[in-house]
């Protein structure tokens, strides 16, 4: 495997991943409801490619993924469907993991829930309060006192080191852009009593009808979204770890704020690099839970579709691109998969090594799966056109390499 280059969102350009012998990666996991839609699948397949590329290079990879197993959308769905939120979360986690296994996505070394991490999160929020980087907000309109918020302005001034975090370090967004996205993605810019509109929640004190946990000096409650990932990553990975991954909708506020929390707590960046997968639509429209147009992996599998074809349909698109799932694209992926499998019976002698090198070069160039897929398709056309009996060594090498590098089982 050549040296891997990856587009770093924070840097704004491709970078060479200098990860040593043990690269490390954290990919933000699902909030367990409506799993696993195609946007989820595309994101985890994308970072599975990086995991596979590193492993192909002979490296031991430390990979951590969380699951946001308590959060407002989950609680709202549980209430709407009259299901206990814990049962809903567990059923969706089980479904997600089954879907990932079907898609041949390598499992993380640590799959960590927010709930099980609360005892780790509480003292870290207390530290931020004691450092003067977090503060409590009085309740209004019947809300209780004591919600804890992160002071982004104070945090941005805590260090003048070249790698220090300040608001915008990861996203590169303007304040107006941040405010718009903050409101759309779970933030509360209009909350009374906050020092800055963009200050994110660290600890939500207990409310009637909501689950809560002991918070020591914070009072009973539950953690905010961003601090969960920060604490889990700092627990299980080195500081800084190699790559923080996720969908592009996580750049702001989630990854921006998580990076700030981490620097405030450890004095070093959370991650060396930030990489993000594009968004997936359906037939040209944004795919969203609110629109009810989610394409679910489990429903495709239940309809008898081959998970390898689903994965191949995803790999036809560069991981950073925004794209739409279409029947035509899926049909093309199924046709490609069939052609690849036929070609194994006609693998030309001496053809496999060059194909493997093409695939490796493509993945090393910012995980260019479409180029790798195109290389396999060219090889398959030549093999099928030739029609000769297969060379057993080439047949085996192609089958193993397509599985190891692209995660497509032939």
Curated annotation (Swiss-Prot):
Top-level EC class as recorded in UniProt: ligase
One Gene Ontology cellular component: cytosol
Cystine residue pairs: none
Cofactor annotation comment: Binds 1 zinc ion per subunit.
Binding site for Zn(2+): 28, 229, 254
Name of one Pfam family that matches: tRNA-synt_1e
Key words of the record: ATP-binding, Ligase, Metal-binding, Nucleotide-binding, Zinc
Motif segment ('KMSKS' region): 286-290
GO function term, MF aspect, one: cysteine-tRNA ligase activity
Cofactor(s) recorded in Swiss-Prot or TrEMBL: Zn(2+)
Catalytic reaction(s) noted: 1D-myo-inositol 2-amino-2-deoxy-alpha-D-glucopyranoside + L-cysteine + ATP = 1D-myo-inositol 2-(L-cysteinylamino)-2-deoxy-alpha-D-glucopyranoside + AMP + diphosphate + H(+)
GO biological process, one term: cysteinyl-tRNA aminoacylation
HAMAP family membership: MshC (MF_01697)
PANTHER family assigned: CYSTEINE--TRNA LIGASE, CYTOPLASMIC (PTHR10890:SF3), CYSTEINYL-TRNA SYNTHETASE (PTHR10890)
Function: Catalyzes the ATP-dependent condensation of GlcN-Ins and L-cysteine to form L-Cys-GlcN-Ins.
Protein name: L-cysteine:1D-myo-inositol 2-amino-2-deoxy-alpha-D-glucopyranoside ligase
High-level lineage: Bacteria, Bacillati, Actinomycetota, Actinomycetes, Micrococcales
